[in-house]
Amino acid sequence: MNAKDEGEHLPLLEEYMDDLRGVDAVVVTHAHLDHVGALPYLVRVLGRRRRVPVLCTAPTRDLMPIMWRDYLRHTRFRVYSSGDVIRALRRVRPVNYFESVRIRGVRVTLIPAGHLLGSAQVLIEADGRRIVYTGDVNFRGSLSLAPAERVDADVVIVESTYGNRRHESLEEAVARFGDVVKSVVGEGGVVLVPVFAVGRGQEIFTALHLVRRELGEVPLFVDGMVRECTRVYYRYLDLLTRECREALEDPWISDEIFHGRVFSRETIARATGVVISTSGMLLGPALEFFRLIAGDPRNAVVIVSYQAPSTPGYLVSQGRNLLELESGVVRVRCRVEVISGFSGHSDYSDILRYLGEVSPEVCILVHGDEDAIYAMKERAESVLREARIEVPGVGEGLEL
């Protein structure tokens, strides 16, 4: 599901009921809402006929209900109920990384994807052939997770989120982030970091830990779902990098996660420090904070996540200094920094390197805006000269 909850951004399952009748299992790559937002609805639709298992990693199982319940609290258009959430969870079968599950002669294996805690690529093997769906994937690695495993396959279904962009290095991203925090807080301002509750939030905690020595004592405020989702990370410390584990064990961060005091947003906006709030596209609580700090040049908003076109985060990142929102007009006088190095997605150079190593017979490009996906297609054609490269439309079937 999209960050918006209307029209074409909603799932179109009812239009594809004939295709859904043959579904034997649902495999989930990770717990971000654009990948699992409609799963309770899908389970309800499939349940009219039979019980279909949902395969995912244990961390994904633990994170999904947090995302669903938040959706139910804030959406204006419900496609499922809290009862559907409970029924969907009953269908979940946790699968370990590299553990294979057989479904009617097909072997399914989940492979680390490096995108966020519990994220997985899906390897499907049948009749001597291998298909891999990367899901959202990070071949470079991040502050919190090791790089994605590179899986050989005859058919690769790969994301194209950054098919037309390259990221700065992690080292550069951390250094720039530290410089922004140090300068803004040093002048008595507030640094707002809008994050996705799962993935980017924990990256920023790790970045803060890495630059803490330079910052000194800086007040830290955590809002939105970040606290609840980060608590899940503590259950799976063995899946995290050493740097991320050390960050989560830092009392400066862990005290805020487990024992953070409750302040009004107005109080925090008048203080100085770092505010980490959902959502990453400057929606929800983060937008409320932004309304309060945007008019003061001493403050800063640091954009560290993908921004869907037309979202407030996208408009601000493109230099818009006047936002017309349902709740009123916001004049943007604060500092705006865009840091791409914290991304949980591979950029085109990493994906091209992977495709060149694997050299699949078929490459299917998905999960990208039109400009990004066709830029990725053009680049992939230069690397996979003998391969069939497809960009399917919504609802379009492909014969392999």
Put a short name on every predicted segment:
Residues V180-V304, P309, V366:
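Hard-cation-handling environments
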Residues E125-D127, A148-R150, A207-R213, L237-D238, ...:
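Short, solvent-exposed amphipathic alpha-helical segments in soluble enzyme
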Residues M1-V27, H32-V36, P40-L215, P219-F221:
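His/Asp/Glu-rich metal-coordinating catalytic cores
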Residues L355, S359-L365:
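Proline-aspartate-enriched helix->loop->beta-strand connector
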Residues G295-C334:
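Redox- and metal-dependent alpha/beta enzyme cores, enriched for Fe-S-associated oxidoreductases
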Residues Y374-G397:
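Short acidic, glycine/proline-enriched helix-loop-strand junctions
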Residues E324-R353:
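Generic long, charged, amphipathic alpha-helical segments
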Residues V137, S169-A173, P251-S264, S279-L282, ...:
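A general structural motif
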